[in-house]
Amino acid sequence: MTYIATRSFTDPDSYYESIGGVGPVEGIITARGNFHATLTCVNFSRLWMRRGEDSLARVAIYTPRMARTTMMFATDQDQPARHIAGVERQPDEVTVVSLGSSEHVRTSAAARWGAVTLPPEDLAALGQAINGRELTPPSFTHHVKPSKSAILRLRSLHEAVGHLAKKAPDILARSEVARAMEEALQEAIVFCLASAEPVHVSSAHRHHARIMRRLEEALHANSNGPVYMSELCAAVGTSYSTLRDCCQERLGMSPKRYLWLRRMHLARRDLCRADPEKSSVTEIATSYGFWELGRFAVAYRTLFGESPSMALRRPPDDPKPGENAESPWQFIKSA
């Protein structure tokens, strides 16, 4: 069975939640402006792919599913470099995410990205069959630079699948077409990894990765209210200066700025989803530690382009799949 879905978004939270399948994704927009994004999801028999485009600079936190190996890349060369796990990555590199990690992906402008995932045992078998050696999941996230022909082939196939998913999903859903496209993508992935030059990662970089993973775990454990810096440093088990260096490296901002942006986005999420008859701006703002409501309202408008009260009153921009007959999702499933 092939699962195909395409969708457009104006709400970043709905966008990140919908990426799914490749693993939980959270995001924080770091630039002002009107957000819009598109997402294409195709799940073949073994290989799953995602293809997205988003309009504003952001930090996304990606936690891969334990049962799948994830490979991420830029879908075209003509865009700014991204920072993945604190290191600037060029558009012609592929990131192979380690199982059980939590990686930060930071962009400075609009981004066009692709991802493919495979069960580790399938990737190993494909490597053995196509290249004569098994391809095993890395113990830590690493970055490789494939040959020019290999990355161009991967991008071309990924784009072709994305085009069919949008313009002719009924054709892509045919078993013979889906099988051919899946096999071609799997071969392209193996050739990318087999032809690649590894990019060195230092031991200090891996230590910072562990600190950032503990940071995200601590934030998730306290996701329903404010988190104070002294408590956070204690939970992470490091000093503020070390945490500051890690956040600057991975997020491009201080931990205080990151916490503030995170609280603002959580407040926005709750405002956009709350029932205005049962909730108030004051209740939601104070639940995230914003006690000075006037300053909160000004900061909210500056960051999101509308007042908190407007966000509370208007209906959600991006209803979830199945909520109504006008769902923006387009689904196709083959037999």
Region spans (language model):
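Short, conserved glycine- and acidic-residue-centered signature motifs
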Residues: P64, H208, W260
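Glycine- and acidic-residue-biased ligand/ion/polar-headgroup-sensing regions
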Residues: S45-L47, D54-H83
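Alpha-helical bundle regulatory/interaction domains
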Residues: M1-F35, P80-S223, Y228-S230, A234-Y240, ...
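Short hydrophobic/aromatic patch on the recognition helix
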Residues: L243, C247, R295-F296, Y300
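C-terminal structural cap/anchor segments
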Residues: T238, Q248, R257-W260
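A short glycine-rich, His/Asp/Glu-containing loop-to-beta-strand
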Residues: S14-I19, F35-L56
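Generic hydrophobic, amphipathic alpha-helix propensity
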Residues: I211-L215, L259-M264
